[in-house]
UniProtKB/Swiss-Prot annotation:
Gene3D superfamilies: 1.10.1660.10. It comes from Salmonella arizonae (strain ATCC BAA-731 / CDC346-86 / RSK2980). Belongs to the CbpM family. Disulfide bonds: none annotated. Interacts with CbpA and inhibits both the DnaJ-like co-chaperone activity and the DNA binding activity of CbpA. Together with CbpA, modulates the activity of the DnaK chaperone system. Does not inhibit the co-chaperone activity of DnaJ. This is Chaperone modulatory protein CbpM.
Length: 101
């Protein structure tokens, strides 16, 4: 099964997510998402970037965070998710050595 990645130009991305170009520049500047091209005029974004921005917009609405706060929150959420997965894997490995009655 092939993976299909949808890409967006700056204009398409802004229309799809509802952010302005100014907000997009700030989001990229904060490292929340990264475009495919470093050249500002030719930025391309994938569907994963769109879902990250939509998640960021929910945080902005629900918690009234500014973009730097959203960047920190997303970083912490990703780290939390990574640690949960690591913990799950370690528990699986540990369960091999623990005998259950």
């Amino acid at each position: 099964m092939a993976n299909i990645t949808v890409t967006f130009t700056i204009t398409e991305f802004c229309l799809h997510t509802g952010v302005t170009e100014e907000e997009l520049n700030e989001i990229v500047g904060l490292g929340v998402i990264e475009p495919y091209e470093d050249d500002n005029a030719n930025w391309q974004f994938d569907d994963r970037a769109a879902s990250v921005v939509q998640r960021a917009l929910r945080l902005r609405e629900e918690l009234a965070l500014d973009w730097p706060g959203i960047a920190v929150a997303l970083t912490l959420l990703e780290e939390n998710s990574r640690l949960r997965e690591e913990n799950r894997q370690l528990l699986l490995r540990l369960s091999r050595f623990i005998s259950h009655p």
